[in-house]
């Protein structure tokens, strides 16, 4: 499938230069992934002279030559996304997910090598020195994708020992802390915040991985704390120290009370405090962070579940009774067992703030309910039974964007529970959610789309959501959103279009053109979703006509030729619906090589794809030489 030109020749080269420049800034080592990342960054950086010379000498490129550079743009954009994710994320999560991460780096190497293969650098007028450098780099990329490094066996062994041994050897913990570059309390604090962010952004159920990360982080905190308190400890002194009363790690103490935290919360500056201590500080009228003295942007308090879990693990391993706090929803998973005691009194106090609080209090309470509802099933039931849903629905109309965002996301998390879906709809939420989808912040729009998808699982809700104007708003998000937003919109649209009436709404709303554009953008990551929606729309007469008028047949044939098994099946099904009873479209399909692609599909496709391909081939053969008569 061909790539569409994203911009002019000069703009394209400038983008490539800018991408390489940004990528070159990621060259510093990042623990166990450092060498793999460093090698890829170094090779990409060496491409810069090639792109810069093409700008300087203003070489005119032919259309077929530009294709390779556009493929390179897509590859470098994907590489940038990977580098940002790796360098800003949790090191422990990357350690546990290292095989997948290494595979992603390998995929990037393969993608860049494929792009270089499409660039005819031997025929482009650049200096001999630059041409030879590109040729050498191309060879290096080819060799790199064929000779990929295996996993670090020492690292795997150390991780297994640290996870499965009750009292890990300090030598192993030292190796791990050095490998992960978590050798100081400050670095461990940053890692704790990174795990916290990972937990908040994770779409699925993170508990198992979260528990493993928390347990290992706790061991590293113990080790680094012991190391820093005794710069040169002998083996004997370490053994003795383990029989003394455990020293509470500084990071577990509240900066205000200096006591072990029971209910750690994060303020807007990023500092963590014991809830009761910081609440007293705020109630006294203070507007600054006690530790940093920075002005607080708001009075909201976000539970630090990562730190709370670490404190629980530390108390358990040191034989200390776990501190109990009053008035909070507690969900703690220790040693593989999960306990959840959602404190109704605490939830009711949050609902009081939703109903009668200031804007800041409403924002903070909605944010806390959002997190609690995400945590587990029991919390979702507790929050709904306490009467939160109507109050959250009311706040969907809040003029404060952050409150609106928290409210729609809290409803999304509550809707995961099947029993809550009906309560959300009964509270009149659909119209307000659609309004957020139209006019909210980008994150609020994305979560509104996800909420509508969740609610649309119930068939009668599909009708109500479509009637409320959601389809047009979802199409806008499909065109304007981030990659995640596009996927949320596409998933919701697909589910809604199972209802026949919503197919017409989607077609009249102009969905076919953006879907066709997504089909043509191989690097956009939305081909699967676009095909799935088109497949369901092609069973509708209006949809069939609109898809054909969008000149989609050549694109569909290309997907049948080169796509994944599932995409080839969907493309064949769409083409079958378009061509049945329409000789003109059959002729177009034949002209772009459909017969060859379909013949191959009858041999190597899925069962459904084989049936559609065989039927289409028969139609094409029957209509050869027949005069064109159009049937809509």
From Swiss-Prot:
<keyword id="KW-0833">Ubl conjugation pathway</keyword>
<dbReference type="InterPro" id="IPR011989">
    <property type="entry name" value="ARM-like"/>
</dbReference>
<feature type="domain" description="U-box">
    <location>
        <begin position="247"/>
        <end position="321"/>
    </location>
</feature>
<dbReference type="InterPro" id="IPR000225">
    <property type="entry name" value="Armadillo"/>
</dbReference>
<dbReference type="GO" id="GO:0004842">
    <property type="term" value="F:ubiquitin-protein transferase activity"/>
</dbReference>
<protein>
    <recommendedName>
        <fullName>U-box domain-containing protein 14</fullName>
        <ecNumber>2.3.2.27</ecNumber>
    </recommendedName>
</protein>
<comment type="function">
    <text>Functions as an E3 ubiquitin ligase with specific E2 ubiquitin-conjugating enzymes. Undergoes auto-ubiquitination.</text>
</comment>
<feature type="repeat" description="ARM 4">
    <location>
        <begin position="500"/>
        <end position="539"/>
    </location>
</feature>
<comment type="pathway">
    <text>Protein modification; protein ubiquitination.</text>
</comment>
<dbReference type="InterPro" id="IPR013083">
    <property type="entry name" value="Znf_RING/FYVE/PHD"/>
</dbReference>
<comment type="subunit">
    <text>Homodimer. Interacts with SNL1. Binds to SD11, SD16, SD17, SD18, SD113, SD129 and SD25.</text>
</comment>
<feature type="repeat" description="ARM 2">
    <location>
        <begin position="418"/>
        <end position="457"/>
    </location>
</feature>
<dbReference type="GO" id="GO:0016567">
    <property type="term" value="P:protein ubiquitination"/>
</dbReference>
<dbReference type="Pfam" id="PF00514">
    <property type="entry name" value="Arm"/>
</dbReference>
<feature type="repeat" description="ARM 3">
    <location>
        <begin position="459"/>
        <end position="498"/>
    </location>
</feature>
<dbReference type="InterPro" id="IPR016024">
    <property type="entry name" value="ARM-type_fold"/>
</dbReference>
<feature type="site" description="Putative E2 binding site">
    <location>
        <position position="290"/>
    </location>
</feature>
<dbReference type="InterPro" id="IPR045210">
    <property type="entry name" value="RING-Ubox_PUB"/>
</dbReference>
<dbReference type="Pfam" id="PF04564">
    <property type="entry name" value="U-box"/>
</dbReference>
<dbReference type="GO" id="GO:0070696">
    <property type="term" value="F:transmembrane receptor protein serine/threonine kinase binding"/>
</dbReference>
<feature type="repeat" description="ARM 5">
    <location>
        <begin position="541"/>
        <end position="580"/>
    </location>
</feature>
<dbReference type="InterPro" id="IPR003613">
    <property type="entry name" value="Ubox_domain"/>
</dbReference>
<feature type="site" description="Putative E2 binding site">
    <location>
        <position position="256"/>
    </location>
</feature>
<feature type="site" description="Putative E2 binding site">
    <location>
        <position position="281"/>
    </location>
</feature>
<feature type="repeat" description="ARM 1">
    <location>
        <begin position="377"/>
        <end position="416"/>
    </location>
</feature>
<dbReference type="Pfam" id="PF25368">
    <property type="entry name" value="PUB10_N"/>
</dbReference>
<keyword id="KW-0677">Repeat</keyword>
<keyword id="KW-0808">Transferase</keyword>
